[in-house]
């Protein structure tokens, strides 16, 4: 098993248990205690976990902004699976809004070099990777959020308002039981709302860690979008 796969599995376990011993992780990840300790040291450096004597606890990321570099490492295998299926929904010649979420960032890996699409994004990471693939991309500009490398604010919103996309792909931090999609970042929520208003079809990408959670700022409700793709069955819910 590769290191990233082990770390992803450890995070899966901690999302369920919150705390686990080294011996427990070694048994369920099928790796030695030495390997587990090495992985946990790396995960602690990334701000994903807190190590303690003989065990580890999942870092509490509720109600605070989590930097993109940390979100990129969290549940990466699941995000890649969702991203791969999301990309399969894109038709040639489409114009697409992509937000700055880590799940959407994974989508770029599955786009072909020189694919015949046009992307509008407020994410510098997304824009840079698309340029490397020689895919047409518009970056909205605006005030840069260092932790997320996304552009926000009125300049960004004005550009989004001036454009129309066939598709929008986005994620957020929470999907409550009553269908509210929400996030802790006010500025990124505003960007997503603008994109939602100017896209013909909207896709919400959601893994199980987001289910049952609610944050301060509401992006939209599931009744406001056309499709959402979620972990496990990847069920597509049509409005």
Give residue spans per PLM region.
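Conserved phosphate- and dinucleotide-binding cores of soluble alpha/beta proteins
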Residues: 2, 12, 19-24, 30, ...
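HTH-adjacent hinge/linker in prokaryotic transcriptional regulators
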Residues: 2-29, 34-100, 108-116, 120, ...
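Generic beta-structure capping elements
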Residues: 59-61, 101, 140, 172-173
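Conserved SAM/SAH-binding loop
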Residues: 104
């Amino acid at each position: 098993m590769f290191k990233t796969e082990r770390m992803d599995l450890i995070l899966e376990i901690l999302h369920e248990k919150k705390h686990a011993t080294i011996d427990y992780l070694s048994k369920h990840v099928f790796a030695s205690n030495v390997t587990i300790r090495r992985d946990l040291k790396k995960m602690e450096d990334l701000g994903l976990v807190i190590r303690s004597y003989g065990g580890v606890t999942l870092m509490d990321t509720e109600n605070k902004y989590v930097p993109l570099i940390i979100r990129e490492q969290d549940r990466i295998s699941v995000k890649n699976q969702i991203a791969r299926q999301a990309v399969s929904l894109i038709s040639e010649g489409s114009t697409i809004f992509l937000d700055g979420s880590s799940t959407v960032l994974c989508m770029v890996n599955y786009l072909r070099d020189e694919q015949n699409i046009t992307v509008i994004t407020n994410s510098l990471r997304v824009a840079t990777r698309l340029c490397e693939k020689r895919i047409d991309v518009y970056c909205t500009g605006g005030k840069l959020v260092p932790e997320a490398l996304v552009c926000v604010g009125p300049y960004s919103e004005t550009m989004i308002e001036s454009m129309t996309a066939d598709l929008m792909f986005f994620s957020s931090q929470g999907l409550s039981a009553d269908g509210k999609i929400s996030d802790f970042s006010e500025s990124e929520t505003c960007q997503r709302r603008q994109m939602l208003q100017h896209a013909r079809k909207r896709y919400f990408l959601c893994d199980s860690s987001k289910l049952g959670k609610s944050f301060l700022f509401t992006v939209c409700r599931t009744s406001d979008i056309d499709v959402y793709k979620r972990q496990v069955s990847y069920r597509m819910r049509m409005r």
